[in-house]
Amino acid sequence: MIDTGSPNTLVDRNSVNTFGLTVEKTDSTVGGLFGRSWERFGASKIKSLAMGNCVVTNVPVAITDLSGMNEDRSAAATGSHIADHKALSYLNGVLGAREMVKFGMIIDCTRQMLYINPNGASSAVSQNLASFLTGRGFTRIPMQLNPNHHFDVEGALNGHGTRFLVDTGSANTLIDTQVAVKSGTGVTALAGYGAGGAGNLVEGVNRTGVKELAIGNFKLANAEVVVAHVSGDVLLSKSTEESNAGVLGQDYLATNFAVIDMGGKTLYLRHPDSR
C-alpha cells in the first residue's frame, strides 16, 4: 500500500520469513489513529525493493502485525484499511513517507499512479509540476512535516481553522469527535467500527456532514466525513499551533484529482467540474 500517513515503510510480521528478513527487537510501541497497542516494532532492512521497473536498495523497515489490514470487512473501514466488497491482494506492507520524500515520489491519486525519481527529489521537477498543474486549474496547498513526522496541511471545518494529515492509506476522511463538535458539526449515532492500521486497534465510528471543509484555499461544500475518537498523540492536541483535526483520506483525494509531490511537499487539488 502507498501510505503517506505512515512515516516509515512497514512490513507485515507474517511476511518476514517470506522475504528472508532478519528482525531486531526495539522498545518502540506500535501506534495508530486510535492509540498505542502492547506490540513493539521490530526493525530490519530490505536489500532490494522493486516498484514497477524501479529498484531501491537498503530500505530500513519497521516490522509489525498488519493482519487487520487483510481481513475481509463488510462495514466501512477507516484509518489505513481500505474496505472493498471484492477480494483484494494480500498486503505484505506499506510504503511510507520517508522513502517517498527521499526519491521525490509523485502520487496521482485519481489515476492510481506512482512516479519515482531514482536520483532523488528535484526542485526543478517540483517547479515544473507546479507550473503544469496550476495552469490547469489545480489549487496548490503546501504540506509540512509535523513533530510526529506526518505530513499535514492547513484547513478549516465550518470556518474553524485547523490542520489535516494527508493520508493516502485511509479510505475515508476522518475527523476527531471532539474537534467535530467544537466546529459545530453534529455527530450521528454509532455507524460501525473502523480499524486504525498498525496496532490493529478498533474504534466505534460515526458519519456526519460538514457544511464547509477547507483544505488550504480549496473548499468542499456539504462534505460527508467519518467521525471517531482519535488519539491525542496523533492529533498533537497539547500543541495549539501544531494540532490537527484528523486525516484527509482517499475519498476526497481521489475524487478531487489529488496529485501529491512528496519531494516538493505540496498537495494539488482540483474540483471534478473544473476544466
What are these regions (language model features)?
Residues 1-275:
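Pepsin/retropepsin-fold aspartyl endopeptidases
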